[in-house]
Amino acid sequence: MTRSIKKNPFVANHLLVKIEKLNMRQEKEIIVTWSRASTIIPTMIGHTIAIHNGKEHLPIYITDRMVGHKLGEFAPTRSFGKHARNDIKSRR
């Protein structure tokens, strides 16, 4: 089920405050966040946000095509460990 149209998109308050401060000063710096559920809004365009994937923070540059998506969509949490080269049983 999607979010109601009557409600505004969710953006964590601490993230919104940091972005608005940077926009007022017209500065660009990496913003570190754990808030993967925050929606990307137009005021974030042009900023680099380091999103936590459970292990580390991945820096993501926000473009206009990302507006409306969640931050967590751009920081994958799972990585595939390759099978051993000489392990024939697992490659069947």
Swiss-Prot record:
Gene3D superfamilies on file: 30s Ribosomal Protein S19, Chain A
Keywords associated with the record: Chloroplast, Plastid, Ribonucleoprotein, Ribosomal protein, RNA-binding, rRNA-binding
Main location, first listed in the record: plastid
Q: Report the locations given in the UniProt record.
A: Plastid, Chloroplast
**GO MF term list:** rRNA binding; structural constituent of ribosome
Q: Write down a Pfam family by its short name.
A: Ribosomal_S19
Question: What family does the entry list?
Answer: Belongs to the universal ribosomal protein uS19 family.
Name of the featured protein: Small ribosomal subunit protein uS19c
Name its species. Answer: Lemna minor
